[in-house]
């Protein structure tokens, strides 16, 4: 439970504003740069980076809704219909980011460890098709926000009422009933397993072997090795800081049969991903480096 007014909500609002201020221009800049390069000659990594940037922009475009929610003391002063839409886009972008970060690690791993085989089989069309599958995977899983609020025969947003500044205001996607929790918590555990743990495991394996293979080759320039290490470190920090705490809350909630009180704070960390991803873009794309 969060106080409806006071330091915690203002802290959340400040983090959202900082994330938007830093992340939005950086991601727009990166998207335009990558799109310009892709128009001349598209590569597999460019396609994946464009999708990762698009996922970040999706989060950032709906972040103002979360700002309004925080400014209103964690209540929802906007039309009720916008609540599931805003949360669907917000949560989808989180898992899209983890999936495309994992896809980038696979692309880097195959290109270094199996260069000849991968070069012969690498096709932009295949990467585009895989990207569509990842979008469908994340969005289909996160569509539970449209179902869970009405599970049990009541509209959660309309039903949860709290008092803020002396007037009634609704809470958005919060304070689930027992019936709703019995529906939501197992699905959250699946999100942890399929959309976080699996991509994270793949990413660790790929970048560990990617960096090891590069460092073992004396003919690779030192600058390229440093970029590889920087890319791996930035990605691991992103997973560890932005995604891991929030997804661990899924496991804790499933075990305890209720959402942990600190869940709202670790959800806050996921938004920082949109501000940290440009660091990954810098290490991943020479076009972005030249543009900067």
Predicted feature locations:
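Loop architecture of class A 7-transmembrane GPCRs
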Residues: 1-3, 70-95, 114, 120-131, ...
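Intracellular signaling interfaces of 7-transmembrane GPCRs
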Residues: 31, 35-47, 108-130, 166, ...
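Extracellular TM2-ECL1-early TM3 structural module of rhodopsin-like
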Residues: 5-17, 40-104, 111-121
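First transmembrane helix
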Residues: 7-37, 58, 64, 201-207
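Seventh transmembrane helix
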Residues: 241-250, 265-292
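Hydrophobic residues within alpha-helical transmembrane segments
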Residues: 14, 18-21, 51-54, 64, ...
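Intracellular effector-coupling site of seven-transmembrane GPCRs
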Residues: 54, 160-184, 189-196, 208-248
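Hydrophobic alpha-helical segments of membrane proteins
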Residues: 61-64, 140-147, 197-205, 235-252, ...
């Amino acid at each position: 439970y969060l106080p409806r007014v006071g330091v915690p909500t203002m802290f959340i609002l400040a983090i959202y504003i900082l994330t938007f201020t830093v992340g939005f221009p950086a991601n727009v800049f990166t998207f335009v740069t990558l799109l310009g390069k892709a128009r001349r000659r598209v590569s597999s990594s460019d396609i994946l980076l464009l999708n990762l940037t698009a996922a970040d922009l999706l989060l950032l475009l709906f972040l103002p809704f979360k700002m309004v929610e925080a400014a209103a003391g964690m209540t929802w002063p906007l039309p009720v219909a916008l609540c599931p839409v805003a949360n669907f886009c917000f949560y989808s972008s989180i898992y899209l980011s983890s999936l495309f970060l994992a896809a980038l690690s696979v692309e880097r791993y195959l290109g270094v460890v199996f260069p000849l085989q991968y070069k012969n089989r690498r096709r932009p069309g295949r990467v585009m098709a895989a990207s569509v599958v990842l979008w469908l995977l994340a969005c289909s899983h996160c569509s539970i926000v449209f179902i869970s609020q009405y599970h049990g025969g009541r509209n959660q947003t309309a039903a949860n009422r709290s008092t803020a500044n002396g007037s009634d205001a609704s809470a958005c996607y919060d304070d689930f009933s027992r019936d709703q929790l019995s529906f939501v918590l197992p699905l959250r555990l699946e999100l942890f397993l399929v959309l976080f743990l699996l991509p994270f495991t793949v990413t660790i394996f790929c970048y560990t072997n990617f960096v090891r293979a590069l460092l073992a080759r004396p003919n690779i320039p030192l600058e390229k090795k440093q970029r590889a290490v920087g890319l791996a470190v930035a990605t691991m920090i992103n997973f560890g800081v932005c995604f891991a705490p929030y997804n661990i809350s899924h496991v804790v909630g499933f075990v305890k049969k209720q959402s942990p009180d600190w869940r709202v704070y670790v959800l806050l960390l996921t938004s920082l991903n949109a501000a940290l991803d440009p660091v990954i873009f810098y290490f991943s794309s020479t076009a972005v480096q030249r543009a900067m």
